[in-house]
């Protein structure tokens, strides 16, 4: 959102006054006529997320905006991905153009307890992590399928990236740069 580099000892998001000094691309898009919204289906007060979101986006969707089955299946970090992506799709389908919506999915975060059948069996952390990644990937895939079927895909740029690397894969040493490689995928009909 604001190109703040990763710092090994300090989470910069906890210092809103520092973030305010940085450029924030959602504000630039707002000035260009875009509507902006942030989706964080968890506790928006965690880690000072609320201050970053409110100073950067016109609106937000948090776990407070979910009910029923989504909240009944809530986990440590908030609402699972399938519910967040369903809400995101519903909102995009009726959004005024142009828009920039950013969504933070959380089911791929520990403790890696995801709903549905286990696709990658195993009780150790690595297998639970891989199963959670499989679940999140399936939720993203369903979201993209809906966007393609409805035509939203045709004139939209989708950017997928991770918020951090992982220490949960056995063969990745957390002290090496490989542990911090994160994907950045640009896709969609707008390309």
Range-by-range predicted roles:
Residues 1-191:
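Solvent-exposed soluble domains appended to multi-pass membrane proteins
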């Amino acid at each position: 959102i604001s190109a703040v580099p990763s710092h090994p000892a300090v989470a910069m998001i906890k210092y809103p006054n520092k973030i305010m000094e940085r450029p924030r691309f959602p504000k630039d898009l707002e000035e260009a006529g875009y509507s902006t919204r942030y989706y964080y289906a968890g506790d928006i007060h965690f880690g000072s997320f609320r201050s970053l979101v409110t100073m950067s986006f016109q609106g937000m969707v948090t776990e407070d905006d979910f009910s029923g089955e989504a909240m009944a299946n809530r986990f440590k970090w908030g609402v699972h991905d399938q519910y967040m992506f369903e809400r995101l799709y519903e909102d995009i389908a009726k959004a005024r153009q142009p828009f920039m919506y950013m969504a933070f999915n959380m089911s791929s975060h520990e403790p890696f307890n995801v709903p549905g059948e286990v696709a990658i069996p195993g009780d150790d952390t690595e297998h639970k992590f891989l199963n959670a990644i499989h679940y999140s990937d399936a939720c993203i895939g369903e979201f993209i399928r809906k966007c393609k079927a409805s035509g939203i895909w045709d004139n939209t740029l989708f950017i997928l990236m991770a918020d951090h690397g992982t220490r949960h894969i056995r063969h990745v040493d957390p002290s090496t740069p490989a542990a911090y490689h994160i994907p950045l995928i640009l896709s969609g009909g707008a390309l």
